[in-house]
Amino acid sequence: MAQKVILGAEDIRRTLARIAHEILERNHSSRDLVIIGMYTRGVPLANRLAENILRFEGLEIPVGTLDFSLYRDDLDSQRFHPTIKNTDIPFSINNKIVVLVDDVLFTGRSTRAAMDALIDYGRPKAIQLAVLVDRGHRELPVRADYIGKNIPSSRDEKIKVRLTETDGRDEILILDNEAGEV
């Protein structure tokens, strides 16, 4: 297997609709809810979740974007050179329920870095994590509150999420080590 499509565009649409319903159910359509997307692909996912919530409940949820690259624990690595993006959180997160959104949960290190960055913007009532894919292999004690799809994978495999906003189409692929980038 060089690459295999795990989810297509319609599957992703349905998955995000389900996650939006789960967020509403857990938080009782709370007006204290804000959604923040983690760069890169968490940003369009956050926007789509907010659009679904607006469509389902008529509730307009504030959406922000978070660049956590300077909070990563591999900054001293020779192979990692961060491209700084714009954090845009034009609202207070104090006493808010923050739903942090990412495309793939793997080791938990990006989530830890994002939470560290987020705390610099205020003191949320709670932070919940929504991910499109959970692939396992945690190195830190991090668990998602909302999971689109669990995709068990080996460490040698790569999960590639493509979204229309960033990649021109919606799909989730699993690639073996020899497949490289596509």
From Swiss-Prot:
Its EC number is 2.4.2.9. This is Bifunctional protein PyrR. It catalyses: UMP + diphosphate = 5-phospho-alpha-D-ribose 1-diphosphate + uracil. It is an enzyme of class 2 (transferase). The lineage of its organism: Bacteria, Bacillati, Chloroflexota, Dehalococcoidia, Dehalococcoidales. Keywords: Glycosyltransferase, Transcription, Transcription regulation, Transferase. The gene is pyrR. GO terms for molecular function: uracil phosphoribosyltransferase activity. Regulates the transcription of the pyrimidine nucleotide (pyr) operon in response to exogenous pyrimidines. Also displays a weak uracil phosphoribosyltransferase activity which is not physiologically significant. GO terms for biological process: regulation of DNA-templated transcription. InterPro entries: PRibTrfase_dom, PRTase-like, PyrR, PyrR_bifunctional. Belongs to the purine/pyrimidine phosphoribosyltransferase family. PyrR subfamily. Transmembrane segments: none annotated. A motif (PRPP-binding) lies at residues 98-110. It holds the Pfam family Pribosyltran. It comes from Dehalococcoides mccartyi (strain ATCC BAA-2266 / KCTC 15142 / 195).
